[in-house]
Amino acid sequence: MMPYRLLIDRAMKSQPIEIWGNCKKAKEMVYIKDFVRLVRNCVDSELEGGCYNVGNGWQVTLEEQIKGIIEVFSPKDKPSEVVYCPEKPDPLQNAFAVEKTFRELNWKPIYSYLDQLRDFKHEMETEPMAGLWGTKEDYKE
């Protein structure tokens, strides 16, 4: 099962969710909707080519990721508890220099991390891609 789906499943069941390592480690979370907009800008661009980093210019900490999952997926009357485990291995961290992408391709992301999670929840509920990703039942523990 995909790690995110495990975390989401725990949140939906109001089960505790562990944060391993340094909860302030952060990474960029580029949403596919923003990425598609960037590809469209590349196709429409009059530039002859180039190398561009894809990023959103802001990072989401591990703590923000977990709290976002809880906010969107946990029952409002019984949200999952966050359990901090600083002794466990740290997650990877990343950030990209994206100023050139923003400037030359006239692009900036418009979707937040919570937008991504809300859309993901909607797709889980409506299952438009069940044939490709499976159904809710495929992700039960």
Regions found by a protein language model. Give the residues of each.
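Flexible, glycine-rich beta-alpha linker
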Residues: 1-3
